[in-house]
């Protein structure tokens, strides 16, 4: 039992290790080549697919691909229209990009756990994680980009003086004694937005990836009749969790998109 436990522990640790340059040990400032590579490839494929569908779009009866794209566009535009009351020409495409990009990165969790590591090992790459959104560095990078957009829209809608006035006078009032409490509360609110975005997405996807690895450990646990029983339980568990996980990856992509729209809308509107 101890050896089996150690084997499973080593298996999980191996699959949870990122590909970094120069054998870096990681940390917040580490460059995770696997997360960057997978996210960029998925982003390029998503943009290329939409570009091809846009080129082939017709005014007549749409094909299945065009109809699917139009459904997604209408769905995302409806979400933006319900929340944001300004010019949607920039925020609409941004929301679409966020939703589909995060969804595709989440969907990498549905690949067999050992598939990409097995492929990369053929090229001499020891570690390779397939799910960028299970990397806290990646989710924080995306949430900090949203944070920059929040600040940008705040200055754009209210001006520098108007935004600074809001930081010191909302929500308690304009009295000088309330300036510092107002400012501190607004700082906490601002900081909580990127943190909540990053941690929510990371936590759900990291947990989902870990569950897949624990289930995969059943495939090699035990021998004889017990081993085959665990193997069958692993297949059933993998299938059931995979079906349930489709809902999770869709909801998390939707939540990230909606919160991005809400936060930017709050920055755009005057208090």
Predicted regions and their residues:
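Selective transmembrane helix interface/packing segments
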Residues: 1-271
